[in-house]
């Protein structure tokens, strides 16, 4: 199966992530490809993850701001629960009464490293759509860096902020809203669904159409067939 998430910004920036995964009893990442480029991001970056071999390739610009590209390739021992590109999919499949769910993620900082995501439901919150009242489950996703780096990250101001996601439950769960950064050290963006807007069309004069349709009706017997 394939999941793709694309954000196109007004300034021309693009966030494009495609994840290929299997869904046999459990979700299993096969391949993930992330591209971030444009003024909205500090540095353009491209990350490729091969779930079968553990190879992770990160392409980004140097910190000195020059145009030259830096490529880092590493092999990681990827656990079966690695969730790059699958977080929203997983949230729509997690039981809302689960106390906490933990999954793994490859973080490009820019050197690839494994971190944990701790997903905790915070209860239901009301919202409305089309005049109809609904309730969405509010999830908090916390990044656990682990090791010595995890111990000093909060002290150095490098602990990533929590991600907040709201999911509409039911037989067909759906994403409602999220508040999260799209890259390490980036601002928190609010992402939510919007209603489609159609171009204004002139009002249809149904009475005129009815009269026009009536005027083209042939009287009885007007149509005949000659042999």
Regions found by a protein language model. Name each.
Residues 1-51, 99-227:
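Acidic, serine/threonine-rich low-complexity disordered tracts
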């Amino acid at each position: 199966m394939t999941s793709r998430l694309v954000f196109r910004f007004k300034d021309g920036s693009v966030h494009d992530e495609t994840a290929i995964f299997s869904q046999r009893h459990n979700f299993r990442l096969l391949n993930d490809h992330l591209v971030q480029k444009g003024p909205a991001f500090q540095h353009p970056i491209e990350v490729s993850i091969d779930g079968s071999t553990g190879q992770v390739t990160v392409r980004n610009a140097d910190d000195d701001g020059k145009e030259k590209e830096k490529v880092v390739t590493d092999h990681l021992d990827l656990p079966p629960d690695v969730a790059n590109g699958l977080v929203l999919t997983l949230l729509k499949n997690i039981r809302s009464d689960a106390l906490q769910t933990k999954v793994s993620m490859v973080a490009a900082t820019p050197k690839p490293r494994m971190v944990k995501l701790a997903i905790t439901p915070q209860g239901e919150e009301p919202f409305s759509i089309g005049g109809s009242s609904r309730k969405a489950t509010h999830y908090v996703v916390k990044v656990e860096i682990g090791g010595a780096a995890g111990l000093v990250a909060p002290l150095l101001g490098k602990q990533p902020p929590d991600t907040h996601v709201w999911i509409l439950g039911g037989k067909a769960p759906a994403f409602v809203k999220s508040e999260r950064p799209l890259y390490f050290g980036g601002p928190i963006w609010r992402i939510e669904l919007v209603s489609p807007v159609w171009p204004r069309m002139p009002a249809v004069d149904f009475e005129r159409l009815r009269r026009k349709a009536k005027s083209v009706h042939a009287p009885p017997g007007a149509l005949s067939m000659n042999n």
